[in-house]
Amino acid sequence: MSTYSLSPARRAELNQKSNWRGTLEVAKDWALVIAGFAISLAWPHPLSYVLSVFLLASAMAGFAILQHETAHRSLFATPSLNEWVGEYLAALPILQSMPSYRAYHMTHHRLAGTPDDPDRIMTESYPVSPGSLKRKIWRDISGQTGIKSIIGLMGMYAGYWKYELTGKVERLMPAPQGVSGYAKKFIGNNGHIAILWQFAIWGALYALGNGWLYGLWAIAFIFVLPTCMRIRQIADHAVVADPLSKNPLMHART
């Protein structure tokens, strides 16, 4: 396996944080959301709806990437922008929680290249048989993965389950006490804002006389996004040179 190193000047350039570039990245993803809906608003046709779904799923994947960058505090030079934008403009619209993701993801980085890496369960079985891969993709495109994700994320907001991205189910202990305890936890984790984001998107479309187009957003989230994220995970961590190496060049591709 060949490796190369970046010059100090190039490395400094790549590590430079920028508020305006971070703002541009966020604006581009939201522009993609607007474009996704605008196409179907302007040209109502089955082909337009299909294109809209894929554009919206692309934007959602972009929000997941923005959540990742803000979790690393690398998108903006101003720390408070990483916190606020990462949570309210990237994570919550796709039912995620940036603080919870950050805690989980930092554990992944700390343990990457070891058997204890929480993400390892998603790719350690690769390469899999064609039949196994087909079954995994079918679970994604049939909506099974997406629906389970929604249920899981709501439970994580409420403090019922521990935050996970692998499909692993683990009760969070100590558990909240009673319905009011779960409700307080849900609100404390901004679960209500994640729900309000869904109503806001529907409300904007309803005001334009096409509230039903929110269904395209739901379809993108439930049926397309899980497939995109699975392929991305496989590309990044499956069948790498040495999954148990502490060298990032050996246990990951990107």
Model-derived segments and spans:
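Juxtamembrane/interfacial segments flanking transmembrane helices
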Residues: 73, 77, 100-103, 211, ...
